[in-house]
Regions:
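Conserved switch/coupling elements of ABC/ABC-like ATPase nucleotide-binding domains
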Residues: 124-128
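ABC family nucleotide-binding domain
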Residues: 1-115, 119-121
Length: 128
């Protein structure tokens, strides 16, 4: 579950965060973000009408909508195919660089981990 509001469309799920924080054009901003995630054709779909990967992308868009200083991402590409995994990784790393945000990713995906500036491995519950 990505904690999307079931009776809100993809745009509404992302725009809500922006509305609550007094953004001037929350729907426009939400659409721009969702378009970056390849979801322009899903703007008006409810979460139940989205695949797991699409739901995950909406949730990530919602999470970065407020341009946080710290992004904590637990398996951000876990439910995605390789093409969408690459896109999400690009968006997260580019966003962190552009906005000056710190990005912490927990992943089993070595390709994703290798993109990080610093890696910490945990093996058998201990830092390796």
């Amino acid at each position: 579950s990505f904690y999307l509001i079931p009776n809100y469309t993809a745009v509404e799920n992302v725009a809500l965060t922006l509305e609550l924080n007094n953004f001037k054009n929350p729907e426009k901003e939400a659409k721009l973000l969702l378009d970056r995630f390849g979801l322009s054709h899903r703007f008006n779909n409810l979460p139940s009408q989205l695949s797991g990967g699409e739901q995950q992308r909406v949730a990530i868009a919602r999470a970065i909508a407020m341009k946080p200083e710290l992004i904590l991402a637990d398996e951000p590409t876990g439910n995605l195919d390789s093409e969408n995994s690459s896109m999400i990784a690009d968006i997260l790393f580019n966003f962190a660089k552009e906005e000056g945000s710190s990005l912490i990713i927990v992943t089993h995906d070595s390709k994703l981990a290798n993109r990080a500036k610093r890696k910490i491995k945990i093996k058998d519950g201990k830092i390796d």
